[in-house]
Amino acid sequence: MSLDAAFLTALLLSTLRQTAPLLLTALGGMFSERSGVVNIALEGILLFGALTAAVVVERLEAALGPGPHPWLPWVGVLAAMGVGGLVAFVHALVSIKYRADQIISATAINLLALGAPSLVLTYFYGNATSSKEVANRLPLWGPEGFQLSPLVYVAFLLVPLTWWVLFKTPFGLRLRAVGEHPEAADTLGVNVHRMRYVGVVLSGVLTGLAGAYLSIGFLNQFVRGMSAGMGFIAL
């Protein structure tokens, strides 16, 4: 391979790897926005997802002992998605049921995500900046010289799938209806509150997935502030 080809390949790989978490977070945010709930808590959810994935995998490695455990990173991914969905549910609950200001609720989550990881890291690792490195990170798929995390492929495959769900399915029609014309949707029998809960929780699940990619796919540990504003960029 020539020097120019090697450079272009490395540039393309780097671009795809950096794009994946932004894409997952942006797709998640779109579900929330389409349902009529502003979710600027994506940055905080991204950090909570990354922290959860790294800590869960590292703690399980410590409990199970040395040796390859190829299924462990997928447990971390599921845990990150669950925590992301849970944090988003809290935002939805406060915003929808208790009618709190959506911006204030989301800002509170972002502020919590600035401090909570330090407490968790200090408790488990004795420092407030990073977790231990995990031995079982997400695998790489693809031909030699062009290998990517499976979550990169997932991120790009979700683009057409999300379009299809939002614009070609009854679920997508209802979700868009409650965001654009909630009164009209309600008169047609659509449960506006339930659809909004679903939209916000989906945004949290996808953003948690992006966080898992950052800590056990792109890197192999959690580092405080590793999202570097990606949640806000994705908005």
Language model features by range: what are they?
Residues 1-25, 38, 52, 60-75:
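Membrane-interfacial amphipathic/re-entrant helices at transmembrane-helix boundaries
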Residues 12-15, 23, 44, 48, ...:
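Hydrophobic alpha-helical transmembrane segments
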Residues 19-28, 44-49, 86-89, 208-210, ...:
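Hydrophobic alpha-helical segments embedded in the membrane of multi-pass proteins
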Residues 66-114, 157-160:
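Alpha-helical transmembrane segments within multi-pass membrane transporters and channels
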Residues 33-49, 96-109, 198, 219-233:
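Short, non-helical or kinked segments that cap or interrupt transmembrane helices
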Residues 114-144:
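Extracellular/periplasmic helix-loop junction at the C-terminal end of a transmembrane helix
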Residues 89, 111-124, 150, 161, ...:
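Mid-bilayer segments of alpha-helical transmembrane spans in multi-pass integral membrane proteins
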Residues 146-222:
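Helix-loop-helix "hairpin" substructures at the membrane interface of multi-pass membrane proteins
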